[in-house]
Amino acid sequence: MKPYLELLQHVLEHGAEKSDRTGTGTRSVFGWQMRFDLNDGFPLVTTKKLHLRSIIHELLWFLKGDTNIGYLSDNQVRIWDEWADDNGDLGPVYGKQWRRWTGPDGVEIDQMQWLVDEIKRNPDSRRLVISAWNVGELPQMALMPCHSLFQFYVVNGKLSCQLYQRSGDIFLGVPFNIASYALLTHMVAQATGLGVGDFVHTLGDAHLYSNHFEQAREQLTRTPRALPTLRLNPEVTDLFGFRFEDIAIEGYAPHPAIKAPVAV
């Protein structure tokens, strides 16, 4: 995970001091790109332990089109709790936009189903794009999309994905985002009969919160370990048919977790 650690160090050393929506304060750079060859191992940060259950269940929750934290709570995932209302609702966030984008005529569009069909139908298309940034519904969202747009690319029988993330919490959020979209790429590839290529992660405002500086420095003292391997149940060929039990991360032996507060 050298690209991630290089970002962490660069922002610590060269980032600009900025205020932010949460009032915490950040150190930030604008415009950064990382590339991960998914054939070299699953890109999961090893210099601190990540909560795999949260990463997997959150992605399955997105793919269900769900926007209520009930499913997450039932599976001991708490990463969205701070933003939910008293009924557990978050408004029309990622799952709604991925599976039920509402057009100007009121018709709902299943972007993810369209994507799978289009990859099979026209793998050379330059329009294999999914957006969560639905301007008309942004005010209703508990949190506007940070990872807002992603595109797939097929060449030589391999599927690659590029994510544009407008805002990236480097210490807490970005490691989750890398793993989540790498997992999604593997799942879409299996559902479309393709191998995997690269995951490219492009960040707009890449920032470290001021109350994460010491944790970031601690992480940079640790030596990265071998990347784990992702195993998907080969019998699942429907993107929306994956369950938690169909996804396994093998050989993950990270350094201990490093606690840090979430900026809300």
Swiss-Prot record:
GO terms assigned for molecular function: thymidylate synthase activity
Coiled coil, from the record: none
Superkingdom of the source species: Bacteria
Transmembrane segments annotated in the record for this chain: none
Annotated residues for binding of dUMP: 21, 126-127, 166-169, 177, 207-209
Biological process terms in GO annotation: dTMP biosynthetic process; dTTP biosynthetic process; methylation
Name listed for the protein in its UniProt record: Thymidylate synthase
Organism of this sequence: Xanthomonas euvesicatoria pv. vesicatoria (strain 85-10) (Xanthomonas campestris pv. vesicatoria)
